[in-house]
Structures are given as C-alpha cells and as structure tokens.
C-alpha cells in the first residue's frame, strides 16, 4: 500500500485503528511528550492532537511509534518485507555485472523502474496554497513542542532540511533538529559529517560571505521522510528512492525564493538562508541518549518565507532515553541494513542494533567464521561501509550459533569465547556523535570491537571447548512423558 501524502497516510492509519484523534486540549509544552511517551511504550497508535493548547493547528505525534507503521510508511505490509527493500538498495549500491544475456534481461525491469522514478516538478502545489513573507513570518504560530523540563525552548524535530552543494546537481535531504530562537530564526543543528553541513561548507568555500539558501519541509509524505533516513546509494536521490517506495514519482515544487525543490504535498515549508558567520548557542535539550546535551554553537537559519497548505498539520516528535520514536525507527531500518551488509560481507548471518543502545551506538553481528582474524575484518567493515555506522562505538561479533537479538546468547558468547586482551580491538580518535559527552573530546572518541567468536588455530594454542548438546533420543522420550509427570 502506498500513500500520496501525509493526509492519505493518516486516513489509512485511522481506517486500520492505528491512529487516535485527541480532542481534549493538550499543551505542546511537556504534556504532548508525556502522552506520546506513554502511548509509544504501550505500542499504541499514532496521535492527532486536534486542540493543542494555545494553537489552532493540529499536531501529529507518535507517527512512527511502532516498527509496523514504519514498514507501512515505506510501502511494506510488515517489518519482514523491509529486507526486500534492503536487497534492492544493496543491488543499487553494489551492482553485479549480468552473468549472461538472460540475467541482463531479468535485471532490466529493476533498472528501468529506477530510471523512471526521477521526481516530477509541478508549477503549483498544495504546500504553497498560503504564502507568508517578511514581517508576516512568525514561527510562534506553529505549535512547536517543548519536550522536557530542562529544554531551553521549543524544538522543531521532524523538519526535512533540503540543501544543495555548489558542486552538486542533486539535493541533499536530512533531518536536523532546529531550536526556535525568534520570530523568524532557528538554529540549524547539523553535525559536521552530515550532508547538509558538508553542502554548507562547500558553499562558504566557493561563495564566501554569500547567504546560503535552505528549505525545511514539515509534514512530507511518509516515503519521503523515511527516504531521508535510509542508506540510499550516492547515485540515487532520496526523492527518487521515495518514488520507488511509493510506486510513483515524487512530486516537487520549486521554492518561491530559491531554486531548491521541496515535496509538493508537504504541510508547511520554511524558506530562507543561512548567513555565513551567524552562529548561536544551541541547547541544552533532552536527547535520545536520555540526557541533556551540552551547549554548542551552530549556524542560524533565517526564515524569509513560510508556505503552507490550507489548515496545515504540524508533524512532531520527541527524543529521550529509549524507547522513543527514533529508536523504533532504528528497529525497523535494521531490517534494511542487513541485506546491504550481506551484499558486501556474505559471511554475515544477522546484524542487530539494540534500541537500548541509542539505536546506533552498539551493533551485534553474527557470522560464519572462515579463518583466523575474520571477526576483526567484519567489525572494521561495519565501521567503514555505511555512513550510518560512523558513530557506532561498540561492535560485537560472534558465531552463527548465537542469536544476535537475544542478550542471554550474546552475553554467554562474550563471557565464554573472549579473552579481554586478545579479543578486544580499540581504535582511538574516530568520529563520535557530538552528543556523546562520554567521549574525551567533542566529536572525537574511541571505538571498541569485541571478538566473541570461537577461536581458531593461530588465535589460540589451547584446545577449544565443545558445546554441550542434549541427547535427542532422551529429549523425545521426556517430551512424550512430560504431561504425565505433573510438573506443570
């Protein structure tokens, strides 16, 4: 099932009983976080707050609060089907030459479909039904959440930031939080390694002192939102990938004040510029770590124009100690990552990002070990293959007899198959999330790899232990007798 815009997705969720309309007045200041947090932990529905206190614009929360809704937003009926999306991305990222004419013809429809998904640019769009410019711009009219008691102010969380570098044809889509600091100003908190920050840096080098155009789309369709957080190959735009998920081309419209193109069906679009050198202190805010982050300086985005639909819906979320919405998103996207990694490392059996590890800070890999040192090759591959794992601090690698998603299994492997000195890999001075205050330097820290595999000759001089295995005949006999024993 696919959805043409956010409103279509809301309607379909409501038909499935997966969305609840809240007509009791609830404040965007702290109260929505409490309601959404309780609902998410109960695996409850998406929430549409129709009467946010002090505002006449409804707020959509907990949209991706279950892995099933994430899968649905990506055009899949269940989480398991996300593996097929991962296989498609793996093939597009590392295409194999056809084995023959028959194989070439078999692959042709896939590549034809990719080529046919170039975005469609419209002249008029729903996101520009209402235009507010200059002195009419007032971000205070948006029901932006203040999520936690120690937050410094309102925070835009689900903004889809659109940028383009001066040397690139394709645009970059990224989701970066934005602190509202004035009627027409927000702080753009993008980390230095992210696409938007890299585009901005290149602009400043090529056009020193010149304002940098930026657009932020709020309330885009689910395929476009999720396309922005998926490991799309550099040769494929996020808009084209969203078209593949949706089954039809992404519709875009040119911004009123720049050449940037934004989703035509977005609820709200913020257009404006970043003036090089204009910076501000961002934070503190409660974050996905479960702590308030330290204050740091980031560029200021000046909003020159707000375009929107008639009676728009404001899409929002909160971040906190897992489980939160980004953690649930990570659980679902985990299934997309597995085939991509397996394409490069066929020996990988499973890959798991535990949500309690803040979605990306720890990874567990199970593999079919083939030679001494193999586990170390795999852990180094995880850190280097996808940008999404740049900030992963811990990689645990173990054998394929272990369930990567069962901590009982994983801990048993660590404690019985590891020698701390021999089997621990430490790498210093690597990129780390700036929100990770445990690192000694902001944005720079260490990584640890744990080799919890069986050790081969060359890795140990000792005879390796044999795992205890029950006698199958005895197990079958006790199965047959069990009901007569009166134990349960």
Swiss-Prot record:
Alphabetical keyword list: Cell membrane, Decarboxylase, Flavoprotein, FMN, Lyase, Manganese, Membrane, Metal-binding, Ubiquinone biosynthesis
Entry's localization field: Cell membrane
Pfam families linked to this entry: UbiD (PF01977), UbiD_C (PF20696), UbiD_N (PF20695)
Main location: membrane
GO BP term (any one): ubiquinone biosynthetic process
Binding site for Mn(2+): 172, 238
Pathway note: Cofactor biosynthesis; ubiquinone biosynthesis
Disulfide bonds: none
EC annotation from Swiss-Prot or TrEMBL: 4.1.1.98
InterPro entries documented for this protein: UbiD, UbiD-like_C, UbiD-like_N, UbiD_bacteria, UbiD_Rift_dom
Enzyme class name: lyase
Membrane topology: Peripheral membrane protein
Cofactor: record remark: Binds 1 prenylated FMN per subunit.
Catalytic center residues: 287 (proton donor)
Record-level GO cellular component terms: cytoplasm; cytosol; plasma membrane
Cofactors required: prenylated FMN; Mn(2+)
Function noted in UniProt: Catalyzes the decarboxylation of 3-octaprenyl-4-hydroxy benzoate to 2-octaprenylphenol, an intermediate step in ubiquinone biosynthesis.
Similarity comment text for this entry: Belongs to the UbiD family.
Name of the protein this chain belongs to: 3-octaprenyl-4-hydroxybenzoate carboxy-lyase
Organism: Pseudomonas aeruginosa (strain ATCC 15692 / DSM 22644 / CIP 104116 / JCM 14847 / LMG 12228 / 1C / PRS 101 / PAO1)
Name of the encoding gene: ubiD
């Amino acid at each position: 099932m696919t959805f043409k815009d956010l409103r279509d997705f809301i309607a379909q969720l409501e038909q499935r009983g997966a969305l609840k309309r809240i007509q009791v007045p609830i404040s965007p200041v702290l109260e929505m976080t409490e309601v959404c947090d309780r609902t998410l932990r109960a695996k409850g529905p998406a929430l549409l707050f129709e009467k946010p206190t002090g505002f006449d614009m409804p707020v959509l929360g907990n949209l991706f609060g279950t892995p099933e809704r994430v899968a649905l937003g990506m055009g899949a009926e269940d989480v398991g089907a996300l593996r097929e999306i991962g296989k498609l991305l793996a093939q597009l990222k590392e295409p194999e030459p056809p084995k023959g004419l028959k194989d070439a013809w078999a692959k042709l429809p896939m590549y034809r479909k990719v080529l046919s998904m170039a975005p469609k640019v419209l002249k008029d769009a729903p996101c520009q039904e209402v235009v507010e410019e200059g002195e009419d711009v007032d971000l205070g009219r948006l029901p932006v959440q203040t999520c936690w008691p120690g937050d410094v102010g309102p925070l835009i969380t689900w903004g889809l930031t659109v940028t383009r570098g001066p040397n690139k044809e394709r645009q970059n889509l990224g989701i970066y939080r934005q602190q509202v600091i004035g009627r027409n100003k927000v702080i753009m908190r993008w980390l230095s390694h992210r696409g938007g920050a890299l585009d901005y840096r290149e602009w400043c080098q090529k056009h020193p002192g010149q304002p940098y155009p930026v657009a932020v789309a709020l309330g885009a369709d689910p395929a476009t939102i999720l396309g922005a957080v998926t490991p799309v190959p550099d040769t494929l735009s996020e808009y084209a990938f969203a078209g593949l998920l949706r089954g039809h081309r992404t519709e875009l419209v040119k911004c009123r004040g720049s050449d940037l193109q934004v989703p035509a069906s977005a609820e709200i679009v913020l257009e404006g510029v970043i003036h090089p050198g204009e910076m501000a202190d961002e934070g503190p805010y409660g974050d996905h770590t479960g702590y308030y982050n330290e204050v740091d300086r980031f560029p200021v985005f000046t909003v020159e124009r707000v375009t929107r639909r008639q009676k728009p819906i404001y899409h929002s979320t909160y971040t906190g100690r897992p489980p939160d919405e980004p953690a649930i998103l990570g659980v679902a996207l985990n299934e997309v990552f597995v085939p991509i990694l397996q394409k490069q490392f066929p020996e990988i059996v499973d890959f798991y990002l535990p949500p309690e590890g803040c979605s990306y800070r720890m990874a567990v890999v199970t593999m079919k070990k083939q030679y001494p040192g193999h586990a170390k090759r795999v852990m180094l591959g995880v850190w280097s293959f996808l940008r999404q794992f740049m900030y992963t601090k811990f990689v645990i690698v173990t054998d394929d007899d272990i369930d990567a998603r069962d901590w009982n299994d994983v801990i048993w492997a660590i404690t019985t198959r590891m020698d701390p000195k021999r089997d621990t890999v430490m790498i210093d001075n690597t990129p780390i999330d700036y929100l990770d205050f445990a690192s000694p330097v902001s944005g720079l820290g260490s990584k640890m790899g744990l080799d919890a595999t069986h050790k081969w000759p060359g890795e140990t001089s000792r005879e390796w232990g044999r795992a205890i295995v029950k006698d199958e005949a005895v197990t079958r006999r006790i199965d047959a007798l069990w009901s007569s024993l009166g134990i349960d």
